[in-house]
Every structure is written in structure tokens, then in C-alpha cells.
Amino acid sequence: MVIKKGFFALSSCTLGLGLILTACGARGKFDQVDDGVIKLATSIQNKDSIAALNTIYKKYKERHPGSYPVQNFQVPGGYSGLRNDIRTRLSAKDGNNFYNIVLNYPDVVSSLATSDMQLILDNVDTKLLSKNFLSFNERIGGVRQKGIYAIPISLSTELMVLNGPVLHYILNSAKKKENGAQMIKRSGSFSTVQKGTMAIDMNDQKTKDLWQKIENAAKANGKTTSTQTSPQPKNAVSSLQLKQAAEGTSTDNSQDAENSDNEIKKTWGEYKEEGNHTLKGYTFKASVFENWNELLDFSTRVANSFPDKIKNQASKKATELQGVFGVDSVSGALFSATFAAGGGDYDKFFFNVKNGRGNFRNLLEKGSSYNNLQKVFNDYKQLISSNGLYINKGGAYSSNFLKFHQLAFSVGSSSGYHFAFAGESAKRLEFGQKAIEYPRDTYEIKAPTNSQNGNGTLLGSFTKSKSNGKEQSGQDEDNQTSETIELYKSSVPSGKEAGKNALAITNQQLISALENAAKDNKTSQPQARSLTASDQVQITQSSDKVIGYITTSNLDIDNNNTFDVGKLNGDKSTSKIIVNATLKTLNKINTLQSEEGIILPHPQKYKSTDPQAVATVQGPSIIGVHANAKENAETQKFINWFINQKETWPENSKGNKNGQNGQMTAAQYFAKSSGYVLPYSETFTKQSEDEHSTTKDAYKILKDVNDGKLVGYSDPSDFRSGKFRDTIVAAFSGAVSSKADFNKFFKGFEQQLGQEYRRG
């Protein structure tokens, strides 16, 4: 068996997508070298997903020892990075370093089809899958022969997370006081009376129920004992409370909500009704979260009602209030809102695929989707002008701020919505103008002592412990083994093994930062521990000087405070070092706990009067790539096993906690490990919400899509749709920064897109 050598860098042409494959020299089908390996390419960064894939590869090798083994190839840059990597390898006719399987969105099939490199999965049994979630194969551009080319294995949707305590402060500040109480605003030596004039429609049952949840969230956030007014641990119970519980009585916990409001006020500032388009005279209903038009209007009113911290603050530090509404996926929000405004009809959307061809003329020739996009944009424009919108840039998800009360609500993927909640004792690293929650799999870098650094090349070291893959909770620490990894300047000395017990630091700015931190007289004394379940930092004496932090979590690398330093042996992700950071431990009242968040579907209509509700359906599919006759057969053999064959899986893994799931297919194991929904027919016909405890909110929405109660939206698949999506996101992000109007936004979008999209 010949193993392919390392991947080589390929330069990409700078031409438009419609010409790249022809101009760069690649047009037409080509065979790959048969190297006896099935290469599966993915850009997934979720560690649970990666661990599940490795377990699946091992299981397949055990069960099919005579078959080609599967190897994982991790491509950086997310789905777009993998998509671009595939196009580049197609353009070079890379028969030595290409893939057999790709986990990505179906537009990759269209890209493969430009060189006839798509692999029809005609030997894969898809009977277990719901036909409703396979039908997108009919909307893939460039494919001549009808069939199954992409199989969805991990579905998610978009969810809205409301920060209950923050919403309570906003609404409680704005609403009319039932007992005639007034808000007193003190200015100088005199007081003026400021009345809240907003109403909460308590005659509407949905609104009444939502307000109750918001009140309960605020009470949980500011929970105190009966004799104390300062926030206490939220699991604390006083002797009086125990006595009242025994007697069947209860205590008035309205003070808890007031404590929460007082604390959140420090971040959000004073509520004010003067000015235009505030909450003055407004009637709040739960329906504001059901459609984009009302949601954006409400968000704008909130921003204008807190001018000192939002409307009048165009520039914000990472530790300050970021706005009212956070959006993780700009394309998802714009596309689903515009699709809903068009009645859930692809013929009225930006682009569609018919007879194997993608058509973008509806938007570019200013048809109905152009008008709908203008309506949606102008709703956003009001919020942008009031500095109330936060959008994800460079991996800085809104959940990073929602969990610290720096946003009121946000929309993001159901697969990651749990990141909106902080841990029991949340820690945050603050550096420069940025702040991040203390990442998982993070360790403290300690300065070397004089005796350690005899030759002057040792920069520092960190110690981590392994728990042999067992869950941390309930495990005997004696079973753990620790290892110390040292960081050296420029190169690793003899006697040390790079990647195993040493790392060479070559970035001069990072070297200087670590050396300067070691010289600093200030000694950092945070608690030394990792936040992951399987790895722990060995606790050291508090006198050890912390000069930085090293993590394998996904970080935005700026080469100023954050640096990529390569991969340690055994790690699936590269290590990153954070320097010049301050570690802060936050009181729970300053964080959003899971019981204080309110989970809702993303807005499913543009306006409440729209006849059709729409839900986003997203997630990667398993896609085959042509190689050669033998590898094509082996590829389909693996995919068929992955989809259909039930196996027994490790009981201590996330996908099979305590063995409770019994036998299941590799696809089921992967979905459960990753927090996705697998669209088998039985998922929606024989299973209940209780069987989807970690994905029940997404499950309910996807079940409604499967049952025809909602129209599912997913991008039509054309090889140009990836660039189209990236371009509209870039143009919108620019409009947020510059506060451009629609005409300027759209003109910039057209210029970046190019003429090739007008050709049909």
C-alpha cells in the first residue's frame, strides 16, 4: 500500500469563480492514485465531533479489516476554507492529494460537478433517511444525472436565546408601575420624575407566560437569602427557607429580581424615554420574537431607550455593552428573512437552481427578492444607526457577550446555543480591546526559575494531566498521569522532543511577551485548572508566576495577544498561546446561567401577516468524490456502513453516555456526539422529544419541517453560491461599520460579486 505524502500548498487563480476551473487548467474528469486509503476531509472544529469521527474510523477498521481504512484530514478555515481548498485541488487536477469523502454543504457537489468529479452514491442504501431532507439533491447545479450525491448526517437550525435577567431590567424599567410608583432620576441637587409608559399585554397568554419566565430568570439571577441583600450562591438555602418549605409556606423573592436589575443597570445604564423611537408608549408582546420586522423594531426602541450605553456609544470595548441584538450568521439571518418575505418560494428568492443551472437574476435584475432584501435591510438599518446590532466577525460569536449580560438576545446555530450560558464559576481573559471566556483545554504557562533556565532559552512551561479519557466527575485522581511541556526560544534543545515534551517558539513578538512577563514583578495567582472534563492542569503553588496561557480551543489569531504555536503530539487541534491577559473570575449575578436563558425558534416570518412560516435547515452532508473504480467502491461501502449498520459504541463517550443508547449506526453516534439531529424517518415518526434531550429545541422545529408545518429553508446549491454568500456577508458587515444606506450597500455588493453571476 502506497501512502500519499504530505499535502502541498497550491496557488489559486485570481479569476472569477465561473472561469477559475477553465483558466487554471482544470476542466474535465481525472482519476486519483489508488493509495488504499479513504481520505475524509472536514473542517469541523467541535472536539466532540472530531473524537466521534476517530472512534468511527477505528470501529470500521475493526469490523472490516480487509477494507480500505479511513483517514481524517482536517482543513482549516471552516466550511469556506474547505470549499476553497477543494476548488484549488480541482483546478490543479490533484490526483495525489485529493479526497474521497467531504463533510460540507451540498454546493460542494456543484463545484465537483464543474470537473465531473462528483460521485453518485447509487450503492448506498438511503431508505432510513427521510425523503423530505434528501430532496435538496434535486436542486444542485451542474449535475446531469439525477441521484443522491449528498446525504445529510447532522442537521441543525437557528435558535434565539433571550437573556432573561437583562430583558427583565429593560422591560421592568420601561413599563408602567401598577402601584403608581415612579422612577426617580436624580440630576444635580434636584430630582425629576421619570415615568415608564410602556405596557406589557397581559391579556395575551403567550406574553403572560413569557413575562413569567423573564421574572423567574431575574429572581434566579439575583437570588438572596431572606436576611441578606447581596447576591449569594444560587444553590444556597437559608435555615428560614428550609423552615418555610417544611411548613408549606414561601418567601417573597421580589427582592431577588430587584438585586438582578440593580446589577445589570451597572452595565446597561439608565432607562430614558426622551428621544425618538423609544419604548415610550410601546406595548410589548411575545410576538415580537416571532417575526423579523417586529424584532428589529423592538431592538431599535431598546437601543434608543438606553442612549448612554448603546445609542451614543459607537465604539465599544470587549468588556462593555455590545448592543441589544446579536447575530452569529449574517447570511443565515438575511437569507431566511428575505426567503420568508417572499412567501417561502425559491422562485422569489435571490437565486434558484432549475434544470441543473443556478440563476441569480431575480436579485441582480432587481426582481421581487431585491425589493424584499431592501425591506429587510432597512429594518436592520434603524438598529445599526442606533448602535444596537452586534454581528459575528472572525469567530467572535454573540454568545461570548450574551452570557455576560452584554446583549439582550441573539440568534445562532442550535448546535452551539449552549455556549450562550456561563459555567458555575465563570472566568474571563481580558487582553487589549478583547475579552473571552476562559477557554476549554487551557493551561497556565509558568515562568522558569533561575535554576531551570541556565542557558537562557527556556521561556516557560505548563503542566497538564490526563485522565485516560475518563470523565472527570467521580474519577480517582490517582489514575491520572501528568506531563510537563516546556517552551523554548527558537529551537528545542537536545534531550527534548518537539511536540511531545517541548515546543519551539519562533515568533519574536511572542518571545518578547513571555520574557517581559517573566521579568514583571507582578505575580498572577489564579486558580490553576483546566475547564475541560478530561484534562486538568496540575495545581501548583500560588507563588508560581503565570506569564501566559496555552489552549487548543478555537481562537482568533491576531499575533499580538494570541499566537498559533503548532500541534502537540496526540492533540487534534493546534495550540495557541495568549499573552498580556488578565484573568477575572465573575460573580454569577454577572453571568447568564442555563436556567435564566429562554430558548425560542428564530423568527419564522418577516411580518406577522406573512402566510408561510419558514425555518432554517442547515448542517454538513457526507459527499463522495470520484477517485478511481476501486476507491469509489470502497468509499460507498464505508458510507453505506456509516448510514445503515448498527454497532456497539464506547459507553463513556458523549454519543453513548453510560451505554444508554445501546446499538446504533455510526451516523447516529456522530449526531448524538455532535449535538445535531440525524434525519432518519424514524427520528420524526417513532421518537419523542425526550429522546433528544440535548437537541429538543432543534428537534421540534425540524420535525415540523418534516411534517410540512414549516417550510424548510436551505441555500440552493450552485458552485457560485459560496462566493455569493461570502460577498453579501462582507458587504453587510461593511454597511454595519460605515452605517451605509441600502443603495450604497447593494452597489458595493454588486461590485464585489462581478458580472459572471448575471449569466444565469
From Swiss-Prot:
Keywords: Cell membrane, Lipoprotein, Membrane, Palmitate, Signal. The keyword Nucleotide-binding does not apply. Residues 1-23 form the signal peptide. InterPro entries: Lipoprotein_10_C (IPR004890), Mycoplasma_lipoprotein_cen_dom (IPR004984), P68-like (IPR054825). GO terms for cellular component: plasma membrane. A lipid is attached at C24 (N-palmitoyl cysteine). It is a lipid-anchor. A lipid is attached at C24 (S-diacylglycerol cysteine). It is found in: Cell membrane. PROSITE patterns: PROKAR_LIPOPROTEIN. Residues 222-257, 448-472 have a biased composition (Polar residues). Residues 220-262, 443-482 are annotated as: Disordered. Belongs to the MG185/MG260 family. This is Uncharacterized lipoprotein MPN_408.
